Amino acid sequence: MSEKYITLEELCGLLSITKATGRNWLRLGKIESQKQIDGQEYFSEEYALYIRNALVSGEFDSLKSRRNKKYVSGKAFYDKYVSDNCGSRETVFELAGGLIESDEAMTDTAMRVILADCALKQLISVDNLENMEGLQDREEEILSIYIENNMDIGCWKRLIDDIIDDKDKARIWINENKDLLRVHYDYQPGEDVLGLLYMSIKDIGSRKAAGSYYTPTDVVKQMVSGIVENLYNTVEKNDAGHMRVLDPCCGTGNFLIQLSKVIPLGQIYACDIDELSVQLARFNLALTSSYQCKKEKAISKTSLNIEDLNKIYDNITCRNFLTKEDTEDIYFDVIIGNPPWGYAFDCDMRDYLHKKYRTAGRRGIESYDVFVERSLELLADGGVLEFVLPEAILDVRNHRDVRQVIADNSDIGRVRFVGDVFHGVQCPAITLQLVKSSAPGHTEGAAIERNGQKFVICNDRHLSPDGFQVRLSDEEYEVLLRLENTGNCTSLRGQADFALGIVTGDNKKYISVELQNGMEPVVTGADVYRYGHDKCDKYILSGFDRYQQAAPEKLYRAPEKLIYRFINRQLVFAYDDRQMATLNSCNIVIPHIQGLKMKYVMAVLNSRIAQYIYEKRYNSVKVLRSHIESIPIPLADEEIQAQLIRMVDHLIECPRDNAEEKCKLYDDIDDIVRQLYGVNSADYEFIKNALSGCKYML
């Protein structure tokens, strides 16, 4: 059979790196292609898997890079997952800590034994099973007693046996590691203790490669509560008993635990590709449902009958949600969950997804985008989808396709901005609720919760694939539209040169804090403030063709140019007429708008009006070229420009330690700019108060 080859782009997707990083690795010899066709590099699938495994194992030096933390391995306590008052929280913490200290290898058998022990002890704590007297001080023997068939647990046997899997291997492991089972667990209603334990002992590297970031219980409770309320308000009472609810990426069943309190057992469906997670989810669902029944009927035992057990096995399955079956699909009234983020699909699955899904583009596949598309396909008309997703899905360019799918099939019902909810993951998240609609693409009536504030969008904003404007109140949005549609304006689109700062490829090698022969000062983003920049304290070798990435030198040497902070939530532009080089944290724009002076354009870009447009339209920490090009620039006459430029020159010349004078000058300039936009005093006060920060950055 012939060797299968993949492109550089596909290799980058497999390694979870950008294409730019892949090109750099290729250029630097960190990776090697196996053949070239028409100038394009190709890599054998065997080689691609070798590189990926080298990253996972740490053999590949680039693993040490900050950008490749995805492949770091180890065990860690997932402290945001359960409620603070969960009684087993400290128990799991101590066990996980002990495993880290002992550097115990977490084999599949080890994980299964530890998890089965936890499941069995939770069941015992609820039911007070017979023959358990006297074992409180011999916790390490309980699972062994069960394995040797000295404990009758009825229908629960199938669930516990599935978790154990191989009893012979379990016996051997227990004999060698009894101390690790000297742990007590009590059943905690509404808490996924098994999930907490599983995440805390599972290899972090494999968890991240699978995109597994399990949802904290408080977020799950909010989602389930809101979606059930929404559903029962829209579904006829007679139809409520026929509703189907699906978690397509159920993990260990945290959503199922909360759903089973309000949805009948037979109406709950779930799936996942992790077999052990599914087995734990089945146990969790069975125990929660049985405990609910025990409470409601005031009986002494948790009642799990064969009929309920069969429902659980029929409805909670180990399968790939994204694989479309030939048989007719079942439609659901609710789909809820937390789809995987950044899952590393293999080559065959990527090929399959490319053929089946609009969101599976050739430039890379984001797993949660495809989950949203598939879920909307399986949602009944009027049905509700609610997922935990990165906030980036609202407006980042890479997610344009999924926004188009959403706009073509649904309306937005609710958005909650929940911040960095996942342990060890710095990525702001949202819970996004969509309602399947035959007349889709609307936001009217959407409930928004952000930064402690709640509001409802009353005036509809049609959903655009370019970005979903749901962060703003109606008043903020109306002001934004007025500014963007100001008359007598132009823009920098097609009327400016843009350039990135220099990427050296090795800052330790090429950048010095001392001026040496052949070196010149270089401006960094941290040096730049509005209208000027600090004296440089870094130096770089001249001759920019030696570096990994540099713009044509004539752009750095332009007689005058504007430089700006690339990574920043505020627009910060400075004037440079000394032909300075800049690093990649500091980019360049050279306006060529006929009739408009460069310092005048700088005054507009540094204004609160421009900041409002940038902040409210894009909510970005990166100032992109497209952001700058979108800002309307008023066409001022020569007299007004001259007046502003005199004030700008005065501000530039004003010493930095004279903060009061600089701020007054900034405010005076800003007042003229706002009048050019036609902004009255009341709207100007609103704009100033609506900005997230009041820093002058002077």
Predicted regions and their residues:
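Charged, often flexible domain-edge or linker segments that flank or initiate folded functional domains
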Residues: 1-166, 209-326, 330, 691
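Polybasic, glycine- and aromatic-enriched phosphate-binding surface used to engage nucleic acids
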Residues: 18-20, 24, 479-642
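Active-site-adjacent bridging/hinge elements
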Residues: 84-97, 191-205, 259-260, 344-353, ...
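Structural motif
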Residues: 98-115, 123, 127, 186-191, ...
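Class I S-adenosyl-L-methionine
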Residues: 156-230, 610-616, 625
